[in-house]
Amino acid sequence: MICAIYSSPKREQTYLYVEKRDNFSRVPEELLKSFGQPQYTMMISLADRKKLAGADIEKVKISLIEQGFYLQIPPPVENLMNAHLSQMEK
């Protein structure tokens, strides 16, 4: 399975995986609007990989088959102040 990966010009560390390069036909219009004009990053073979840097490869494969795309968003930013206050309360 080969897929194309695009980065978002609007959202840092946000990537869109699609089945074929420049084919966004299965990506919802609202998602494309909030994502911005996709910036081509690379083509990769998922068959040759056991893992991906920022996504669960099995979830990516399933999403590509079922939906035709996968959206990778960055993990939430940890609120260090809340973590510190939680530790202080203990």
From Swiss-Prot:
Coiled coil: none annotated. HAMAP family: UPF0745. Residues 1-85 form the YcgL domain. This is YcgL domain-containing protein plu2139. It comes from Photorhabdus laumondii subsp. laumondii (strain DSM 15139 / CIP 105565 / TT01) (Photorhabdus luminescens subsp. laumondii). InterPro entries: YcgL-like_sf, YcgL_dom. It comes from the Bacteria.
